Design a protein with these regions (language model features):
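Rhodanese-like catalytic fold shared by cysteine-dependent sulfurtransferases
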Residues: 1-30, 35-40, 45-158
């Protein structure tokens, strides 16, 4: 539409496929493990204090820069599929990361808009076998989006 390009997105079923191809990782600290063994790279934009519970196969936050630089340096690295997710559907950091990666020349960047909130809600309903995470999270609401109506009321009362 118009002059702006639309953002490529994936849904929870696409993410389940990614999880099925994720393999357990052992002693991979600061290696090119993620850039050489998978056809995709899964990146999250969660704050550093929220890295304990992730979707399996997610690149550790401390390895993101090394992995991205390795892809940039590689001959076909910029065509690698990269999937970005965050806290929830209202998490703007996901779209900022998307723009950053596209600006670096990556061609196949996609966004999982539901983020951890949707994933954990689906896990709660359908189970961890269908919606696995790297650890069990009991407080699903810490991933929920802020209420738009609540912020509107605050503005109206000012």
């Amino acid at each position: 539409m118009g002059a702006s390009a639309s953002i490529a997105k994936v849904n929870y079923e696409d993410m389940q496929c990614v999880c099925r191809t994720a393999t357990p990782i052992q002693d991979h600290k600061y290696s090119n493990y993620y850039t050489t063994t998978r056809p995709w790279l899964l990146i999250n934009t969660l704050p550093p204090g929220m890295q304990a519970c992730l979707i399996p196969g997610t690149l550790p936050i401390e390895e993101e820069e090394v992995a991205i630089n390795a892809l940039i340096a590689g001959s076909d690295g910029k065509t690698r599929e990269i999937i970005v997710y965050g806290k929830n559907a209202n998490d703007d950091t996901v779209y900022k990361k998307y723009q950053q990666l596209m600006g670096l020349g990556f061609k196949n960047v996609r966004v999982y808009p539901g983020g951890m909130f949707e994933w954990l809600l689906l896990q709660d309903i359908y189970g961890a076998a269908s919606f696995p995470t790297t650890s069990k999270e009991m407080d699903l609401l810490k991933y929920k989006p802020p209420s738009g109506r609540q912020s509107q009321r605050l503005l109206m009362n000012s």
